[in-house]
Amino acid sequence: MKDYLQTVTGPVAREDMGLTLPHEHLFNDLSSVVDAPCYPFSQQLVDKKVTAEIQWALKHDPYCCADNMDRKPIEDVIFEINNFISLGGRTIVDATGSESIGRDAQALREVALKTGLNIVASSGPYLEKFESQRIHKTVDELATTIDKELNQGIGDTDIRAGMIGEIGVSPTFTEAEHNSLRAASLAQINNPHVAMNIHMPGWLRRGDEVLDIVLGEMGVSPNKVSLAHSDPSGKDVAYQRKMLDKGVWLEFDMIGLDITFPKEGIAPGVQETADAVAHLIELGYADRKRQRSTVLTLIYW
C-alpha cells in the first residue's frame, strides 16, 4: 500500500489529507441527456436559467432544464471550494471519471492551484447512455486506458488520476457496463493501491450481480470497493448487511439532495438516511460506510 494520495497537483501524504469528501463532481456536464419535461408545470423550466425562484420545481424534474444540466462556471466552483476550506476541508475526490460527463483535468488542477485544496481526479467509464460508442471496446482496451490515466496522465496532460470510478451501473445493467466493470477491476488489480467507486442504481438491488463480477470473477480486494448511492436501500437492512459482510464500503451520498430522479425514484430525506446509518452503527458496521453529499447539478450550488 502506498502512503500517499495522487492528486491533480502531485502526491500528497496520507496524513495531510485532512477532512476529505470522497466523492464529488466539480465540473460534470450532463447536457448530453437533457430530457423532456415529466410534468405539465415543468414545461416552463426547459429554457430557464437556474435561480432560487424555480428551485422547488427543479427538485421534481431536474433533467429537463438545460442550464441545470450544464457545466458549472469555474468561479462558482472556487466559491464553494473556499466555503469547504473555511469549514476545515482539505481534500476532495472528484468522481467524474470520463469526458462523457464533463471530466476536465486541467480545470481541476486550476481550482487546486487557486484554492490550495487537494483534489483527486478519477478514471473510468460511466453509464452506457452517456458513453455511447466509447464504452464498446474490449475489456483490455478499457483497462489499458484507465491504467494509463493512473500512471501517466489523463489525455495529453501529465495529470494523473487517483481513483477508479465512478464506474457506471445503470438500472438495466447493460452488457457494455458489465465489461467496463471488468475493465475497472482489472485496472484496480494492476494498481492495488487505488480505490474503486461504483455508481449503483440505488432503488434496485444489483449489489450481488456487481460484486459477483468485481470480487468473485475478477478478484478485487473488497476493502478497495465502495458502492455509491446506498441511501435508497437504507430501509433494506438485510440487503445492506449482505453487502457490508462481503467487506465492501457503502456510500450514503444523497444527504440533503431532496430531489426526484426521473424514472428511478425520490431521494430519501435526511432523517431516513440518518436513521439507516445509525442503525448500521448499532449493528457494528461503523467502519464500513461513508457519508457524503454529492453535488450533481446547478441547483445545489
Functional labels for PLM-detected ranges:
Residues L19-T20, T91, N118-V120, A161-M163, ...:
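Structural preference for beta-strand elements that scaffold enzyme active sites
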Residues H25-R71, G124-D140, T294-W301:
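Active-site gating loops and adjacent loop-to-helix segments of metal-dependent hydrolytic enzymes
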Residues L30-S32, D104-A105, L204-I213, K235-L244, ...:
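Histidine/acidic-residue-rich catalytic or RNA/ligand-binding cores of hydrolases
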Residues V50-I78, T96-S100, D104, E166-T174:
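Divalent metal-binding segments
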Residues N82-S86, A107-L117, L150-I159, L186-N190, ...:
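Acidic (Asp/Glu)-rich catalytic clusters
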Residues R90-T91, E110-K114, N118-N191, W249, ...:
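Active-site gating/metal-coordination segments in enzymes
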Residues G155-G234:
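Divalent metal-binding pocket/active-site signature
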Residues N197-H199, F252-I255, Y285-W301:
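Short acidic/histidine-rich active-site segments
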